[in-house]
Regions:
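Conserved hydrophobic/aromatic beta-strand scaffold that supports enzyme active sites
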Residues: 2-5, 49-51, 69, 80-82, ...
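Glycine-rich beta-strand-centered segment in the early N-terminal region that forms part
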Residues: 4-22, 33-75
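Adenylate-forming
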Residues: 23-29
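NAD(P)H dinucleotide-binding glycine-rich loop of Rossmann-like/cofactor-binding domains
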Residues: 28, 39, 61, 67-130
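Residue-level signal for nonpolar/aromatic packing positions in well-ordered secondary structure
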Residues: 50-52, 65, 91, 110, ...
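Short, conserved catalytic or interaction motifs in soluble domains
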Residues: 57, 93, 155
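Mid-domain Rossmann-like dinucleotide-binding core that forms the NAD(H)/NADP(H) cofactor-binding site
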Residues: 101-103, 107-166
Length: 169
């Protein structure tokens, strides 16, 4: 179904989507099993990377042409989507759109879990289960950056090999 392009409402921008992350919440939303269900029709895709094409009233820190990543809730698997300016993060030129689109949910979830909830301290031991997946791999990276001794566990050798490549960074 064709839908109208989003408009930049006050406090928002429109982003030309170059890449969208597909994460576990997206799967659950499509299956109708997530904690919220957007009204139909909707497009999944909660995290995106792209270029701002329109800036809404009251947005001072962003301009057309800026490369950004954002958490948009849903609607990211589209040519264009809208995002609140306060949720945007700059996408460095050194990071491609594909990597940028996978960044916010995995790294944000991990940082929140380790820093805010777990209060991980330098020198502590961190056991990462599911170490070959998106959040697991970021937990290895962030845990090491925070000075923890990281132990990785995964369900098969292929996933362990991914984890080992990160542990020995």
């Amino acid at each position: 179904e064709e839908i109208e392009d989003p408009r930049a409402e006050p406090g928002m921008v429109v982003v030309d989507v170059k890449a969208a992350g597909v994460s576990f919440p997206d799967v659950l939303i499509v299956q109708g099993k997530y904690q919220f269900q957007p009204p139909f029709p909707f497009s999944p895709g909660g995290e995106i990377a792209g270029v701002i094409s329109e800036v809404g009233e009251g947005v001072a820190d962003w301009k057309e042409g800026d490369r950004v990543i954002a958490m948009v809730g849903n609607g990211g698997i589209a040519e264009k989507t809208s995002a609140y300016a306060a949720t945007l993060m700059p996408l460095p030129e050194s990071m491609d759109f594909k990597d940028g689109a996978a960044f916010p949910l995995n790294y944000g979830t991990t940082y929140y879990a380790l820093k805010q909830r777990g209060e991980l301290k330098k020198g502590e031991t961190l056991l990462v289960t599911g170490a070959g997946g998106g959040v697991g791999t970021t937990a290895i990276e962030i845990g090491k950056a925070m000075g923890a001794r990281v132990i990785a566990a995964a369900s098969n050798q292929e996933k362990l090999d991914i984890a080992l490549s990160l542990i020995h960074i």
